[in-house]
């Protein structure tokens, strides 16, 4: 599929930028050669990973949300209603001005996000307290005219996989509880991807336009920068007032609703591939790997018996729900190992004449490279147990690496040094001026106040020296 040299090798992951670009092409995740800046094409293999990843989040949301689909085009008169919201997006909007050669009476925006597409319909759908809570989500493409350097899966002009949920509630507190639930859902989602994330409440100048507050989750990339991989916004009754979303309460009074919205994009796949991958290619958790097991016949004699054994193992694993393939191509074993290691297949099974003589197979883990002989009679149980071990091992390794790169800092100089390697945990008095001054002095940004950390100490803001019990994450970001 990809136009590449035979057995092309990746740059070392120590040079993360080159490794990342090479990985996308050689492992056949995305082709960057589409002739529109910031728009990229999924290879079928990459799209299979995407499908498996988004199946997880669909499954989590479907427990108490309903999936829907709203139009891509938003009339200008609806889009321009919420002034603060629009101010945050006006420089990024693509506009449709003509239908064919005929100018449109009303300009149409390509959705940068869907609040202004969805909420006019919510006004029609929400009538009574019995209609609440309303929890819908969709997975769609969105368009933003990014003027910064674009990068596949990370910073795009066409986001191809934007999961956005929009909920309506009777009270502010109920909406706040939904924001907390959204963050719990994201933490569980990323746990399934074996990715530890850091939730934090964004500072006021970095909240979603039109929201009361924003909580986001960030992951740490190999180069020490953080990637925002999920957001949840408490919208208060701001959008309800703009779009006239009211319900009749138990006393018969018309009351403005309170709302939330929360989203995840294909950045989740960027952090999945980047966190676990190595110099040989991808390392995928079993749940999202398109191929979970590859069987390599080692044929130098007794080919029929070896292939029969491989097919028997394949059938047994498939009956257990495992995604498995046999590579019986005429390539040498080393070339096969290279191919499937690049694709991140969690387990490789090798079966040759010697293995058959011992009624065994060789099992190799992609994440650690460990190999061991296991009985053919228990191959299914061995594979399924390894899946659990691999998942746990990947999460523990990623969590350990994250924790090692979070640094307690008390001075501006400390922060300057540590953000080159990871995330600084820094005292902050809460004043916007100090926060912005800190950003400027250290060449990094405040992510937010950790929401999963209880502070029991007293600190001094490194900018103004005021005492505070609050600390914030500071990091370089994408």
Swiss-Prot record:
It comes from Methanococcoides burtonii (strain DSM 6242 / NBRC 107633 / OCM 468 / ACE-M). It is an enzyme of class 6 (ligase). Keywords: Aminoacyl-tRNA synthetase, ATP-binding, Cytoplasm, Ligase, Nucleotide-binding, Protein biosynthesis. GO terms for biological process: prolyl-tRNA aminoacylation. Its main location: cytoplasm. Catalyzes the attachment of proline to tRNA(Pro) in a two-step reaction: proline is first activated by ATP to form Pro-AMP and then transferred to the acceptor end of tRNA(Pro). InterPro entries: aa-tRNA-synt_IIb, aa-tRNA-synth_II, aa-tRNA-synth_II/BPL/LPL, Anticodon-bd, Anticodon-bd_dom_sf, Pro-tRNA-ligase_IIa, Pro-tRNA-ligase_IIa_arc-type, Pro-tRNA_ligase_II_C. One of its GO terms (cellular component) is cytoplasm. It catalyses: tRNA(Pro) + L-proline + ATP = L-prolyl-tRNA(Pro) + AMP + diphosphate. Belongs to the class-II aminoacyl-tRNA synthetase family. ProS type 3 subfamily. GO terms for molecular function: ATP binding; proline-tRNA ligase activity. Its EC number is 6.1.1.15. Pfam families: HGTP_anticodon, ProRS-C_1, tRNA-synt_2b. It is found in: Cytoplasm. This is Proline--tRNA ligase. Consists of three domains: the N-terminal catalytic domain, the anticodon-binding domain and the C-terminal extension. Homodimer.
């Amino acid at each position: 599929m990809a136009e590449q040299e035979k057995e092309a090798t990746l740059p070392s992951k120590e040079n993360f930028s080159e490794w990342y670009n090479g990985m996308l092409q050689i492992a056949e995740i995305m082709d960057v050669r589409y002739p529109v800046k910031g728009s990229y094409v999924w290879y079928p293999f990459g799209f299979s990973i995407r499908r498996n990843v988004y199946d997880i989040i669909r499954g989590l949301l479907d427990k108490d949300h309903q999936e829907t689909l709203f139009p891509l085009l938003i009339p200008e008169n609806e889009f321009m209603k919420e002034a603060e919201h629009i101010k945050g997006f006006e420089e990024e909007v693509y506009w449709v001005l003509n239908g064919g050669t005929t100018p449109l009476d009303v300009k149409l925006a390509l959705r940068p996000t869907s609040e202004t597409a969805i909420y006019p319909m919510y006004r029609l759908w929400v009538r009574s307290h019995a209609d609440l809570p309303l929890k819908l989500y969709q997975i769609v493409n969105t368009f933003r005219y990014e003027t910064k350097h674009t990068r596949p899966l990370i910073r795009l002009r066409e986001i191809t996989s934007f999961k956005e949920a929009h909920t309506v509630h009777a009270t502010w507190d109920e909406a706040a509880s939904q924001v907390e639930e959204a963050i719990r859902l994201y933490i569980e989602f990323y746990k399934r991807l074996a990715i530890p994330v850091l939730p934090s409440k964004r500072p006021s100048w970095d909240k979603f336009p039109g929201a009361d507050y924003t909580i986001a989750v960030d992951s740490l990339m190999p180069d020490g920068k953080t990637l925002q991989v999920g957001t949840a916004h408490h919208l208060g009754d701001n959008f309800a007032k703009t779009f006239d979303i009211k319900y009749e309460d138990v006393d018969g009074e018309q009351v403005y609703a309170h709302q939330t919205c929360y989203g995840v994009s294909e950045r989740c796949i960027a952090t999945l591939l980047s966190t676990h991958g190595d110099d040989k290619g991808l390392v995928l958790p079993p749940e999202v790997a398109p191929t979970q097991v590859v069987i390599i016949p080692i044929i130098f004699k007794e080919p029929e018996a070896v292939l029969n054994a491989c097919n028997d193992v394949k059938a047994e694993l498939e009956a257990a729900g495992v995604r498995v393939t046999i590579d019986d191509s005429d390539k040498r074993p080393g070339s096969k190992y290279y191919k499937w290691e690049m694709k991140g297949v969690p387990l490789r099974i090798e079966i040759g004449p010697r293995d058959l003589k011992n009624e065994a197979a060789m099992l190799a883990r992609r994440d650690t490279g460990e190999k061991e002989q296991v009985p053919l009679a228990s191959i299914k149980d061995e594979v399924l147990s390894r899946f659990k071990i691999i998942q746990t091992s990947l999460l523990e390794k990623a969590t350990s690496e994250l924790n090692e790169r979070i640094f307690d800092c008390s001075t501006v100089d400390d922060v300057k040094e540590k953000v080159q390697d990871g995330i600084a945990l820094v005292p902050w008095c809460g004043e916007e001026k100090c926060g912005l001054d800190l950003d400027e002095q250290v060449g990094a940004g405040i992510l937010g106040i950790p929401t999963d950390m209880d502070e029991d100490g007293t600190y001094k803001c490194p900018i103004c020296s005021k005492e505070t019990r609050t600390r914030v994450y500071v990091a370089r970001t994408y």
